[in-house]
Amino acid sequence: MTQAEKGDAENGKEKGGEKEKEQRGVKRPIVPALVPESLQEQIQSNFIVVIHPGSTTLRIGRATDTLPASIPHVIARRHKQQGQPLYKDNWLLREGLNKPESNEQRQNGLKMVDQAIWSKKMSNGTRRIPVSPEQARSYNKQMRPAILDHCSGNKWTNTSHHPEFLVGEEALYVNPLDCYNIHWPIRRGQLNIHPGPGGSLTAVLADIEVIWSHAIQKYLEIPLKDLKYYRCILLIPDIYNKQHVKELVNMILMKMGFSGIVVHQESVCATFGSGLSSTCIVDVGDQKTSVCCVEDGVSHRNTRLCLAYGGSDVSRCFYWLMQRAGFPYRECQLTNKMDCLLLQHLKETFCHLDQDISGLQDHEFQIRHPDSPALLYQFRLGDEKLQAPMALFYPATFGIVGQKMTTLQHRSQGDPEDPHDEHYLLATQSKQEQSAKATADRKSASKPIGFEGDLRGQSSDLPERLHAQEVDLGSSQGDCLMAGNESEEALTALMSRKTAISLFEGKALGLDKAILHSIDCCSSDDTKKKMYSSILVVGGGLMFHKAQEFLQHRILNKMPPSFRRIIENVDVITRPKDMDPRLIAWKGGAVLACLDTTQELWIYQREWQRFGVRMLRERAAFVW
């Protein structure tokens, strides 16, 4: 037999063997993809949109983008009828500023700030010489603006074609005389539900849908009809409202038309974006500051707290301090959008946390409002530039009275669509389990409550017990759970815990105390040690010169002595990998899109349509 004949015979045998395997049901080997795996992953990531919605700024982009598009998270809606009263959501102004006690609280807070400034020595070993506002006021009151140009170069948004809505920068630059309402759909990290026009849940969701759809079309150049080919990664706050998250997911999948979604927490995404596995995340935003401890991709529930102040409060405080020093731009109004933009710019330009910068300094700034001449102002400032950012550590300086300033992680209100929510599980527990829980409640209530103290030691265990056991029980539910005196005792214990929580949440914790409290709520000393060794600051609210050294000094001085002895270094990171701290969380969302484990987290449109909120309980990477 020739070589050619032998080859033909072998080929024939191979083909026969393949046919035999097919008949037996043996799977054929998968044909290797024509596109290399790395390129496939890139193509897949290019069809994932990462959305990080903030109170003031929306960050949105493809997972493959180096940087996201950042636009003001605001919408202007045209009036349906002429003559309607204008409605504008406030930016720098907020509830609780004009109470009778506000000014006294502001002054007391400023005294604490001044005491802290004086007590810390400069790097040369001497103490700072305080500068009173009177020293700058006499000079500033004489200052008059110089006209740089009769045209500022900025213009109001053209509304001659009567658009139904305007988004982002265009909404900010709508002429106040035009018939448009201004809405910021997210306030202090939550949906901006309020009793005024456009304040219902439906209206807020409609505003968000319009803003996000506009951004996707304009900045990502994706036609809305093509969103069925795209998937979305949505970043949510660590302390989230389940109802709001459910509605946002429904909007993204069913109304905007994305094919799938992954929902994840900002803090965990910040660790992905920074490349750190375990760290205490301090997210200082424009309107809220959130603190929590993240370990190996898990945000510890008991360590989460949200403070109802941020960068915009520092801007408003800086304006108040400049007014005391005779701020020469006397027409400045906190109700004017252009003036709010100016004050934000002045804060970012002049404020710092450097103890070595002291005495009076000369500064200048320009005002370029639309349809107005360009003006140049010169003025002097002293300690005001340091006092304003220090208000983050002494929030009484903000002068906010009668508002809930600290939020802990609470048990949710329950969802009728979710058959496994906590309320349902509690209602179906056996009598034995309920009795055991009641006994545990009484024991925990008998222990002293330490919220009034320094928020350390035994007191830190209380929020953990509260979160684990806090239930909203009516009298009828209480009677069902246990009989007679047991029911009364349990309700008394519950009320005492709720009183402790309300007292704690009424206080405005300083940033350093909030960090210490969060770390102190960790379950083990090893975890606490990890968190003290790595504190990551993200967001744009603490982007001041020398903020890293300042925060590090505050934490070192206030941390428990037992940890001070064993921790070699408290590492405060404000710019991981030299990245903009405002973009870290978004970048982490983009990293999440590329992880292999993320494949298990996707919730697809058909699944959501069929199972609804149950998919979040099944697929979310955190405890829903």
Swiss-Prot record:
Q: Which residues carry this modification: N-acetylmethionine?
A: 1
What does the UniProt keyword field contain? Acetylation, ATP-binding, Cell cycle, Cell division, Chromosome, DNA damage, DNA recombination, DNA repair, Mitosis, Nucleotide-binding, Nucleus, Phosphoprotein, Transcription, Transcription regulation
Query: Taking the first listed entry, what is the main subcellular location of this protein, grouped into a coarse class?
Result: nucleus
InterPro entries named in the record: Actin (IPR004000), ATPase_NBD (IPR043129)
Q: Name one GO molecular function term.
A: ATP binding
- Enumerate the Gene3D superfamilies for this protein: 2.30.36.90, 3.30.420.40, Actin, Chain A, domain 4
Q: Where is this region: Disordered?
A: 1-29, 430-460
Bias class Basic and acidic residues marks the residues at 1-25
Q: Which Pfam families match?
A: Actin
Q: Which GO terms describe its cellular component?
A: centrosome; Ino80 complex; nucleoplasm
GO BP field: cell division; chromatin remodeling; DNA recombination; DNA repair; positive regulation of DNA repair; positive regulation of DNA-templated transcription; positive regulation of telomere maintenance in response to DNA damage; regulation of cell cycle
Where does this polypeptide localize? Answer: Nucleus; Chromosome
Instruction: List residues modified as Phosphoserine.
Output: 132, 412
Residues at which ATP binds: 55-56, 283-286
How does the record describe its quaternary structure? Component of the chromatin remodeling INO80 complex; specifically part of a complex module associated with the DBINO domain of INO80. Exists as monomers and dimers, but the dimer is most probably the biologically relevant form required for stable interactions with histones that exploits the twofold symmetry of the nucleosome core.
Job of this protein: Plays an important role in the functional organization of mitotic chromosomes. Exhibits low basal ATPase activity, and unable to polymerize.
The record's comment on protein family reads: Belongs to the actin family. ARP8 subfamily.
Record PANTHER family: ACTIN
Q: What is this protein called?
A: Actin-related protein 8
Q: What lineage does UniProt assign to this protein's organism?
A: Eukaryota, Metazoa, Chordata, Craniata, Vertebrata
Q: Which gene encodes it?
A: ACTR8
